[in-house]
């Protein structure tokens, strides 16, 4: 945890470190090294800290390469998490920094059984899709058991227990059939007062539950380890943690300073950077820049390092957000959660903050290859106006008559965001999660130069991975400093003798 990570006090005295990038990895490294006594300088290309943790508020400018700049005009207090948007409760390190610096958190509703699933031209609530699928799968398995098709696969006692489990799991009738939708799937008419008994829905068929391949991931989503409840978000915007760490090291951070070259000067490093033609020299460097950008920066890296930096693909996720009155709450009883669709916008995120307030920011598209791996590239290629159109059409399907209430739209295509060009590295992992020699090479220091970032962790695409990688780089750097100290002391003893 962050509270338990601490270098020996004063262990960095007399040593200097330049850190490239003020995203989470860079900020964490700066904070930990600074309090250990290192002379720290952080160079950040943007006019803000946080990197891919980016909260857009009214008055902010959105720059995408090759496109007209956008200017957010959200009402006061409203915001859009254009990048990172949720934190799993198991991400102890980043949550540790939130705790340490007093960042207030609230629940992020990552699943809502009432939210719509729009697939195959039909919109149905998630609860009906999920629990009717439970019923249909259980029905098939119960039939197989009753027809003795599984007698050779399981012992009799286990089969009996499994058959009983299916009865409850799938809401089957006494004959093992899923003849009518369970109450878990919702109602044709809701239960009410004195004379309002509920009426059940007809059970959906497997064809209706599995209309196309795109629907597979939404069924699986909630089972992903990092997507299970409880999920969290900082109150007021995801950038709160980055800003809190930045506050601890603000004098050390220089914004608007893009790196133009990374050079080794003997046992030290020299960084060439903007604005203008400036240089910063230090004993050590920690590079937290994305690999796809680092590859293009002139450097003195070894041939193996340069080769390892090539060909790492980054996910070009795209989001679209609108301000709107909270019709999803007033008309559909949706307080947070996600809607899913086989349309190009893939995913809709209902805000988990400001419940019952007049307005909110609705993320009407979050395209990351959830339902089709080609969707991020296809959606990113659309003009901003086309992204808005596709997103509004999706909201209209989910909430008929309400798309006209969407206003103040903004869109961020991460493949076009300067100094990012993607939200995170995509590793083609082998058996057991192995990433091979390329990954191993990227982890290695280059003399006095160390490396960190979400791409150098097994918690990629998350703030947790960025923070963990910073800790790893710091430990390597600290070990070298300690070793240099021991070597120096040994020389002194030998000279004195």
Predicted regions and their residues:
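Conserved flavin/dinucleotide-binding core of flavoenzymes
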Residues: 2-6, 28, 36, 268, ...
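N-terminal glycine-rich phosphate/pyrophosphate-binding loop and immediately adjacent elements
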Residues: 4-143, 494
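Short glycine/proline-rich turn/loop motifs
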Residues: 7-11, 71-80, 217-230, 247, ...
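Rossmann-like dinucleotide-binding core of oxidoreductases
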Residues: 124, 132-146, 151, 294, ...
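Core domains of carbohydrate- and sulfate-ester-processing enzymes
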Residues: 127-148, 198-213, 292-293, 428-444
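Active-site/ligand-binding neighborhood in enzyme catalytic cores
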Residues: 145-258, 265-268, 281, 297-298, ...
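Mid-domain catalytic core of redox enzymes
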Residues: 255-367, 398
């Amino acid at each position: 945890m962050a509270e338990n990570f601490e270098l020996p006090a004063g262990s960095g005295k007399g040593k200097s470190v330049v850190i490239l990038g003020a995203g989470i990895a860079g900020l964490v490294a700066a904070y930990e090294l600074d309090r250990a006594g290192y002379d720290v300088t952080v160079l950040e290309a943007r006019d803000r800290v946080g990197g891919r943790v980016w909260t857009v508020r009214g008055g902010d400018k959105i720059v995408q390469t090759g496109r007209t700049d956008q200017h957010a005009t959200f009402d006061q207090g409203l915001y859009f998490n254009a990048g990172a948007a949720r934190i799993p409760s198991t991400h102890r390190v980043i949550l540790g920094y939130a705790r340490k610096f007093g960042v207030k958190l609230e629940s992020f509703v990552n699943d809502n059984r009432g939210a719509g699933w729009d697939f195959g031209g039909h919109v149905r609530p998630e609860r009906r899709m999920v629990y009717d699928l439970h019923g249909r799968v259980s029905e098939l398995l119960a039939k197989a058991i009753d027809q003795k098709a599984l007698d050779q696969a399981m012992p009799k006692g286990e089969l009996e227990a499994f058959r009983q489990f299916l009865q409850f799991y799938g809401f089957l009738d006494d004959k093992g059939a899923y003849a009518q939708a369970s109450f878990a799937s919702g109602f044709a008419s809701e239960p009410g007062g004195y004379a309002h008994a509920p009426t059940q829905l007809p059970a959906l068929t497997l064809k209706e539950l599995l209309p196309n391949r795109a629907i597979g991931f939404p069924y699986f989503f909630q089972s992903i380890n990092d997507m299970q409840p409880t999920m969290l978000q900082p109150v007021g915007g995801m950038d709160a943690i980055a800003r809190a760490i930045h506050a601890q090291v603000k004098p050390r951070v220089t914004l608007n300073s893009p790196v133009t070259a990374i050079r080794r000067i003997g046992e030290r490093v020299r960084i060439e950077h903007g604005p203008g033609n400036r240089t910063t020299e230090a004993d050590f460097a920690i590079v937290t820049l994305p690999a796809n950008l680092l590859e293009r920066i002139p450097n003195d890296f070894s041939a193996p390092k340069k080769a390892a930096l090539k060909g790492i693909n980054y996910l070009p996720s795209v989001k679209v957000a609108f301000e709107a009155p909270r019709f999803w709450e007033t008309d559909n009883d949706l307080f947070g959660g996600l809607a899913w669709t086989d349309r190009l916008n893939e995913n809709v995120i209902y805000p988990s903050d400001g419940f019952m307030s007049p307005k909110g920011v609705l993320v009407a598209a979050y395209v990351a290859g959830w339902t089709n791996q080609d969707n991020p590239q296809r959606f990113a290629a659309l003009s901003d106006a086309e992204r808005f159109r596709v997103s509004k059409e999706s909201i209209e399907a989910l909430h008929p008559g309400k798309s006209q209430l969407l206003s103040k739209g903004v869109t961020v295509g991460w493949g076009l965001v300067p100094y990012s060009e993607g939200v995170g590295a995509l590793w083609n992992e082998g058996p057991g999660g192995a990433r091979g020699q390329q990954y191993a090479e990227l982890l290695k220091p280059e003399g006095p130069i160390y490396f960190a970032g979400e791409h150098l962790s097994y918690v990629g695409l998350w703030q947790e991975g960025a923070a963990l990688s910073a800790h790893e780089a710091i430990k390597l750097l600290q070990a070298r400093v300690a070793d240099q100290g021991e070597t120096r002391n040994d020389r002194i003893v030998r000279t004195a003798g």
